[in-house]
Swiss-Prot record:
This is NADPH-dependent 7-cyano-7-deazaguanine reductase. It is an enzyme of class 1 (oxidoreductase). The keyword NADP applies. Keywords: Cytoplasm, NADP, Oxidoreductase, Queuosine biosynthesis. Gene3D superfamilies: 3.30.1130.10. It catalyses: 7-aminomethyl-7-carbaguanine + 2 NADP(+) = 7-cyano-7-deazaguanine + 2 NADPH + 3 H(+).
Amino acid sequence: MPRKPPSSPKSSPLQLGRAVAWPDSPEQAKLDRVPNPQKGTNYVARFTAPEFTALCPVTGQPDFAHLVIDYVPGSWLLESKSLKLYLASFRNHGAFHEDCTVAIGKRIVAAIKPKWLRIGGYWFPRGGIPIDVFWQTGAAPRGVWIPDQDVPSYRGRG
């Protein structure tokens, strides 16, 4: 059976396919979702953001992280352009590493209601100490292959 042609970008509520201004803050950013055509199948989808940036809420200095987001979709998939815009909205947002990482995970869960989600925030050193932050919604569905996030611990020259 032929598929229905996609709606034109102008009539779609999604940000995908349209010129969209960068959101000024995470609160203003919109996360879009699209129907999961494989909703009866448990599988893992992964987003990797190796150049995530936020601001230290005390000094205003930039903080950098490598984020890895894994989730088992339910009825919805997270649309990647909206995720890119959401993550970019943190560039001028002040928050501690732990708050950024957990808030991103919770916001995605609220938007798409996955069966399971985990996020790893691998933050580059500030003051000589790297901070790695991990959060997940609970146990992964049984029988789902969950690959390692495969981000090595930060290591200096030693």
